[in-house]
Amino acid sequence: MGLVSKVVPLADLPAAARAYAEDICSCGPLAVQAIKQSVYRGGRMTLAEHLKYEQQLASEVFMSEDAHEGLAAFREKRKPRWKLR
């Protein structure tokens, strides 16, 4: 299920948590928002409902201006300029 992705010594935990958070923050905000919505609402749905909901969220994200910007930035080897649209 992927709930644990890394184990670090307790002394290294703050730095590892910050690095993980920075990695998430570098992703497209609409995609991160959709993932959070899926996790929060998914626990109250059947599997079939959740899969349909995820498909709807993914379609919205993939059709967004930010999705096109992310692909363009990747092709042009630059940081994306997110617009939240």
Where are these regions (language model features)?
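C-terminal long alpha-helix characteristic of the crotonase
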Residues: 4-52, 60, 65, 82-85
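Short acidic-aromatic low-complexity motifs
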Residues: 68-69
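Terminal low-complexity tails and localization/encapsulation signals of metabolic enzymes
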Residues: 72-85
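Active-site-proximal glycine-rich helix-loop-beta segment
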Residues: 1-3, 78
